UniProtKB/Swiss-Prot annotation:
Binds 1 Mn(2+) ion per subunit. HAMAP family: PEPCK_ATP. This is Phosphoenolpyruvate carboxykinase (ATP). The lineage of its organism: Bacteria, Pseudomonadati, Pseudomonadota, Gammaproteobacteria, Enterobacterales. GO terms for molecular function: ATP binding; metal ion binding; phosphoenolpyruvate carboxykinase (ATP) activity. InterPro entries: PEP_carboxykinase_ATP, PEP_carboxykinase_C, PEP_carboxykinase_N, PEPCK_ATP_CS. The keyword Chaperone does not apply. The gene is pckA. It comes from the Bacteria.
């Protein structure tokens, strides 16, 4: 199965010794057999479901652990990275000393030494000029399966001379007993060294740490080259018109970009360069809680052989109870992108975007289902990144809580948010793109805006009917709202209509406006940021 001549000897360069066997770039059938091996115990063992997909559990780590993320502070990163301990604004880029890095690296390499290992060589980025060649090393078959699904799978020819730009060593079974003395958050760690170009994982089994780890790396490298790096999904119409959907986990990026009328470019991570929009990934990582064939047919039918389910409840007959959130609200499935029929082929990239959609899940019930943004409002709401953290996507979050996440992805930003905003705005201006704010969250009824209405809103954005619609201005937020749209309940377009009285909306709106204003203060120490204050609520 080995295409190139990778040997256990090669792994000694990473500090991994006495490897029993290398399973190099296994095919899906091999992984299927490995995951169902009855000799496996605990979280290593997969369960076969009636669709042919394998289901695995990730233990207490059913979401990312942002408090356990660290980056080595050295000459490479000292003056470029957006550090957690410098300046204004909250982020997860906690500095790590070289000494502690060496200790953590020793723990992981010791864990992987003397073992039977799975190696996956894959690409991150569909543009051959800027993609990263990544080597993933793990002792767990399903973790190899996960990255095979999620990253771009090289051809046999591309594997012949594959040279990794970045190494990910997943030591999920090891923890750091010296964390207290080292001033770390816990015994678990997700650590990066951008000089050595290595990511280490210890203690957490959550597959998303590998996916989002590489996203953080791309978020460091690309904007420094003038390329937009975006936490968004993207699709393209028959006429070549590209739409991108920004939003945090659970706001609808995957669901809304998976549209039978349009071809999917990707569901979560993209770049935007001189040629257009391109996917970082080769797969999708969709939430499955309360999944149904009726509401989300493409995702539902993508769950078949080679898909990998996480933390779902499998019944005795092999069927999956997608409504069961007893393990987590953040149940997931990863699958190769070709499990979706309507995708861009052969490479997941297209032209420049004409529609930029910011998805927010407003827990206050204040924002309208859709509004058309001015250029300054686009920058303001991109930097604000308002949404609600939805249950389960991070450990310890069980109820929707309002949050501000710069660029709709602060957890993954490696540079200061204004750098991403500047690059995005330049790309949008060059392409003549228009931005919209879409609330997929709640309104005054206390219920979530229906996916039917949201899909009709997206259709109106894509086909241009929203741009042609008459609008009125929502007070306090100064947002332009259409008076009516095809297929959308007109009553809900003005959020004030969903309350018992206008005063009830006003009260909540004032509270939310105050949060926006307080959050944006961290950007007002620059002339560019101060100039955007008037684009927000007042």
């Amino acid at each position: 199965m080995r295409v190139n001549d990778l040997t256990p000897q090669d792994l000694k360069a990473y500090g991994i010794n006495d490897v029993q066997e290398l399973v190099y770039n296994p095919d899906y059938d091999t992984l299927y057999q490995e995951e169902l091996n009855p000799a496996l115990e605990g979280y290593e063992r997969g369960v076969l479901t009636n669709t042919g997909a394998i289901a695995v559990d990730t233990g207490i780590f059913t979401g990312r652990s942002p408090k356990d993320k660290y980056i080595v502070r050295d000459d490479t990163t000292r003056d470029t990275l957006w550090w957690a301990d410098k300046g204004k604004g909250k982020n997860d880029n906690k500095p790590l000393s070289q000494e502690t890095w060496q200790h953590l690296k020793g723990l992981v390499t010791q864990q992987l030494s003397g073992k039977r290992l799975f190696i996956i060589d894959a690409f991150c980025g569909a543009n051959a000029d800027t993609r990263l060649s990544v080597r993933f090393i793990t002792e767990v078959a399903w973790q190899a399966h996960f990255v095979k699904n999620m990253f771009i799978r090289p051809t046999d020819e591309e594997l012949q001379d594959f040279e990794p730009d970045f190494i990910v060593m997943n030591g999920a079974k090891c923890t750091n007993p010296q964390w207290k003395e080292q001033g770390l958050n816990s015994e678990n760690f997700i650590a990066f060294n951008l000089t050595e170009r290595i990511q280490l994982i210890g203690g957490t089994w959550y597959g998303g740490e590998m996916k989002k780890g590489m996203f953080s790396v791309m978020n460091y490298l690309l904007p420094l080259q003038g390329i937009a790096s975006m936490h968004c999904s993207a699709n393209v119409g028959e006429e070549g018109d590209v739409a991108v959907f920004f939003g945090l986990s659970g706001t609808g990026k995957t669901t809304l970009s998976t549209d039978p009328k349009r071809r999917l470019i990707g569901d979560d991570e993209h770049g935007w360069d001189d040629d257009g929009v391109f996917n970082f990934e080769g797969g999708c990582y969709a939430k499955t809680i309360r999944l149904s064939a009726e509401a989300e047919p493409d995702i539902f039918h993508a769950i078949r052989r080679d898909a990998l389910l996480e933390n779902v409840t499998v019944r005795a007959d092999g069927t999956v109870d997608f409504d069961d959130a007893s393990k987590t609200e953040n149940t997931r499935v990863s699958y190769p992108i070709y499990h979706i029929d309507n995708i861009v082929k052969p490479v997941s990239k297209a032209g420049h975007a004409s529609k930029v959609i910011f998805l927010t899940a407003d827990a206050f019930g204040v924002l309208p289902p859709v509004s058309r943004l001015t250029a300054s409002q686009t920058q303001y709401h991109f930097l604000s990144g308002f949404t609600a953290k939805l249950a389960g996507t991070e450990r310890g979050v069980t109820e929707p809580t309002p949050t501000f996440s710069a660029c709709f992805g602060a957890a993954f930003l490696s540079l200061h948010p204004t750098q991403y905003a500047e690059v995005l705005v330049k790309r949008m201006q060059a392409a003549g793109a228009q931005a919209y704010l879409v609330n997929t969250g709640w309104n005054g009824t206390g219920k979530r805006i229906s996916i039917k209405d949201t899909r009709a809103i997206i259709d109106a954005i894509i086909d241009g009917s929203l741009d042609d619609a008459e609008t009125f201005t929502l007070p306090m937020f100064d947002l332009a709202i259409p008076t009516k749209l095809p297929g959308v309940d007109t009553h809900i377009l003005d959020p004030r209509n969903t309350y018992g009285s206008p005063e009830q909306w006003q009260e909540k709106a004032e509270a939310l406006a105050k949060l926006f204003i307080e959050n944006f203060e961290k950007y007002t120490d620059t002339p560019a940021g101060a100039a955007l204050v008037s684009a927000g609520p007042r």
